[in-house]
């Protein structure tokens, strides 16, 4: 068997290693694009980014925290709090935590079902349903939660602390207190017409009819 020169063998090995690196680079790029495609299905809002420090024996170690809201714009929303040495990593951790804490918000015609007040630490947020066309009347932190949840018409007011973290958690606490008219009617043993206003029921029937008319187009 003919022996291959040492120089030629080294060149072949270098080419193989270079090809492996290029293949891994292409695969990693494809994976990042796929992850970007997954993220595009959700609404993401970064409410606050803070730089924090930890005092250790050798001095101070700085890191960043990010408060992130993630929702599908159709009743699902979650809140995440990420911490890392770099801002993008902190946001990514916040997004991952927010997706793990998803919960469903009962909506009728783009607004909430009834007035509710949520409290978290020193934060107090009051939410009231609004008529179509009102819009989201809320501050920055509460607005991010409501928009990601898919609320289009609502009146919100902060009655406590102005801290963004407290306001966000108070808003989430208020949304988790919402109940559907069917639940209240079943608990009281009454028909739903005696529990929910006629305008609310009409708006729900209209939204259900609209969703039913759009659904066949999405399945094609």
Swiss-Prot record:
Keywords of the record: Acetylation, Ribonucleoprotein, Ribosomal protein, RNA-binding, rRNA-binding
Entry GO terms, CC: cytosol; cytosolic small ribosomal subunit; plasma membrane
InterPro entries (alphabetical): Ribosomal_Su5_D2-typ_SF, Ribosomal_uS5, Ribosomal_uS5_bac-type, Ribosomal_uS5_C, Ribosomal_uS5_N, Ribosomal_uS5_N_CS, Ribsml_uS5_D2-typ_fold_subgr
PROSITE patterns (UniProt xref): RIBOSOMAL_S5 (PS00585), S5_DSRBD (PS50881)
S5 DRBM domain: residues covered: 42-105
Single GO MF descriptor: structural constituent of ribosome
Region called Disordered, residue ranges: 1-39
Residues bearing PTM N-acetylalanine: 2
Gene3D superfamilies: 3.30.160.20, 3.30.230.10
UniProt-listed Pfam families: Ribosomal_S5, Ribosomal_S5_C
Keyword Acetylation assigned: yes
Biased composition (Basic and acidic residues): 13-39
Domain notes: The N-terminal domain interacts with the head of the 30S subunit; the C-terminal domain interacts with the body and contacts protein S4. The interaction surface between S4 and S5 is involved in control of translational fidelity.
Entries under HAMAP family matching the protein: Ribosomal_uS5_B
Oligomer and partners: Part of the 30S ribosomal subunit. Contacts proteins S4 and S8.
Function: With S4 and S12 plays an important role in translational accuracy.
Family in the record: Belongs to the universal ribosomal protein uS5 family.
Record protein name field: Small ribosomal subunit protein uS5
Organism whose genome encodes this protein: Mycobacterium tuberculosis (strain ATCC 25618 / H37Rv)
């Amino acid at each position: 068997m003919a022996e291959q020169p040492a120089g030629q063998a080294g060149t072949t090995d270098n080419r193989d290693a270079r090809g492996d690196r290029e293949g891994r680079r292409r695969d990693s790029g494809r994976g990042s694009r796929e992850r970007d495609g997954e993220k595009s299905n959700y609404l993401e809002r970064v409410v606050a980014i803070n730089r924090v420090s930890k005092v250790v024996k050798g001095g101070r170690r700085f890191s960043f925290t990010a408060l992130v809201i993630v929702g599908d714009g159709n009743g699902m929303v979650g809140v995440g709090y990420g911490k890392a040495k770099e801002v993008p990593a902190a946001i990514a951790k916040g997004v991952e935590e927010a997706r793990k804490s998803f919960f469903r918000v009962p909506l009728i015609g783009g607004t909430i079902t009834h007035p509710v007040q949520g409290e978290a630490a020193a934060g107090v947020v009051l939410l009231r349903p609004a008529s179509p066309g009102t819009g989201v009347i809320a501050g920055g932190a509460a607005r991010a939660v409501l928009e990601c949840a898919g609320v289009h018409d609502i009146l919100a007011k902060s009655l406590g602390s102005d801290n963004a973290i407290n306001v966000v958690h108070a808003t989430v606490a208020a949304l988790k207190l919402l109940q559907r008219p069917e639940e209240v009617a079943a608990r009281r043993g009454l028909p739903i017409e005696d529990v929910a206003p006629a305008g609310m029921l009409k708006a729900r029937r209209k939204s259900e009819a609209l969703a039913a008319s759009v659904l066949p187009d999405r399945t094609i």
